[in-house]
A protein has these predicted regions:
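Canonical Rossmann dinucleotide-binding motif of NAD(H)/NADP(H)-dependent dehydrogenases/reductases
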Residues: 2-33
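Active-site helix of classical SDR
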Residues: 115, 158, 166
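Residue(s) in the substrate-gating loop at a strand-loop-helix junction
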Residues: 142
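C-terminal substrate-recognition "lid" of short-chain dehydrogenase/reductases
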Residues: 216-240, 245
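Short, small/polar-rich loop/turn modules that mediate ligand/substrate recognition or access, typified
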Residues: 174, 179, 233-236
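Conserved mid-core segment of classical short-chain dehydrogenase/reductases
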Residues: 83-101, 124-130, 151-154, 194
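Alpha-helical segment proximal to the catalytic Tyr-Lys
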Residues: 120, 170-172
Length: 247
């Protein structure tokens, strides 16, 4: 797909990997719209829309605004998500069911909610001239989908759901010439990790097989761009983790 003047939607684009992705795609010539729940987010994107991905009405309204003000996206990168750690049974007793539901609602249901609305909008586009496709959807999972740690039952379940729906979504949306892929990052130097003490960061980096460091948000963004460009990548879950296997 040719990047120039194509519209790219990034959810969770106000910070972390989403922000890096938005900046990178904009530098490559795309017109970027960010959907994020943060009201006061600072963004250089062409369009910013406040959106709660867990609410169908919020997502549908955000899409209407996007189409009216910029056009229909050909690219969607779902980065919106949360990663709270909570044990099934902790010092205060059983994990509140509401805590589990919240993670599923934001990470899994939120991703699906955006995907369904975006796919419907993309299905009405003309085929892109060079690639003969209508669009590309890239979802964000995590290596926790495969090797979740203590306290990550909810998070791992939410990201595992994203992994599991990648292939069926790709198969179903193929009729509209829309590709669906998922990236499963490992330890990335997002604000969450960078706010930890340096010794903790160093300890985490040492667990990566090679290179012995935290991943960079820009490396996630670069992989997103490659997935957009490579027309044969479809229905795939790609680990971006330096061969890290969590124990």
């Amino acid at each position: 797909m040719n990047f120039t003047n194509q519209i790219a939607l990034i959810t969770g684009g106000a910070s972390g990997m989403g922000k890096a992705c938005a900046q990178y795609l904009q530098q490559r010539g795309m017109r970027v719209v960010i959907w994020d729940k943060q009201e006061d987010a600072q963004s250089d994107a062409e369009l910013f829309i406040q959106c709660d991905v867990t609410q169908d009405e919020s997502v549908e309204q955000a899409m209407q605004q996007t189409i009216a003000r910029l056009g229909t996206p050909r690219v969607c990168v779902n980065c919106a998500g949360i990663a709270p750690a909570k044990r099934i049974v902790g010092k205060e007793g059983a994990m509140p069911l509401a805590a589990f539901k919240q993670v599923i609602e934001v990470n899994l249901i939120g991703t699906f909610n955006v995907m369904r609305v975006v796919a419907h909008a993309m299905s009405g586009l003309e085929l892109e001239r060079t690639s003969q496709e209508r669009g590309v959807i890239i979802n964000t999972a995590s290596i926790a989908a495969f090797e979740g740690q203590i306290g990550q039952a909810a998070y791992s379940a939410s990201k595992g759901g994203i992994v599991s729906m990648t292939l069926p979504a790709a198969r179903e949306l193929a009729q509209f010439a829309i590709r669906v892929n998922t990236i499963a990052p490992g330890l990335i130097a997002t604000p969450l990790l960078l706010n930890m003490p340096q010794e903790v960061q160093d300890s985490l980096a040492a667990t990566v097989t090679f290179p012995k460091r935290l991943g960079r948000p820009e490396e996630f963004a670069s992989l997103v761009a490659h997935v957009i460009e490579n027309e044969m990548l479809n229905g795939e879950v790609i680990r971006l983790d330096g061969a890290l296997r969590m124990r």
